[in-house]
A protein has these predicted regions:
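Charge-dense, helix-prone N-terminal extensions
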Residues: 1-198
């Protein structure tokens, strides 16, 4: 099912969303959740609480979208078998497990990630991500790419680092670094560059 065909749901609080998650089949396509912005007339579950509920049930948050001035939406889906884990979500899960909030489906996702190495390979949040030595070396060998990398906005910088981190083998990592450095050397970026103000 395409993401624009998913239902848009509103939950008042965490127990309501948890009850919905518990009733979903393993092959659920997911849903968009509607969240109130500050000052909205209708309160909803907070995005942070919804993420906790989702992780506890083996689901994960994804794409964001605007609804109007009072509400925004986020897509929630069951976690795919090989999907990457973030360090932030790993820490959330550890807190939820300590509180006894992890469901059997959530535990199965965690156990599988630990068994196949995705748990240990969790990626750093954007605020803490930094280039590894192999990427630094490749950038140093290509001054134009280094200059473009130094000027990237935070979204483009993180997009480069994330793609390198997601390479599964040393050969795949080397290939990905070469592709990204060549892209930067051409003055290209993953996301369109934002116009500078001023």
């Amino acid at each position: 099912m395409a993401s624009d065909e998913l239902p848009l749901l509103t939950f008042a609080d965490a127990p309501a969303f948890e009850a919905w998650l518990a009733a979903q089949p393993d092959n659920s396509p997911g849903a968009w959740l509607r969240f109130a912005k500050k000052g909205a007339s209708e309160p909803t579950i907070s995005k942070s609480d919804a993420i906790d509920c989702a992780l506890a049930h083996g689901w994960v948050d994804g794409q964001l979208g605007r609804i109007d001035d009072a509400f925004f939406k986020t897509r929630f889906t069951p976690r795919r078998p090989r999907s990457a884990w973030s360090q932030v979500n790993r820490q959330r899960v550890e807190r939820l497990a300590a509180a006894g909030r992890i469901s059997s489906r959530g535990k199965a996702q965690i156990d599988q990630a630990k068994a196949d190495g995705r748990w240990a390979a969790a990626y750093a949040p954007q605020s803490q991500a930094a280039p590894d030595h192999d990427l630094e070396t490749a950038l140093d060998a290509e001054p134009t790419a280094r200059a473009v990398f130094a000027e990237l906005d935070s979204a483009n910088r993180y997009a480069v680092l994330y793609r390198v981190h997601q390479a599964k083998t040393p050969d795949a990592r080397a290939t990905k670094i070469a592709e990204l450095v060549a892209m930067l050397a051409r003055g290209e970026t993953i996301h369109p560059r934002r116009a500078r103000r001023g």
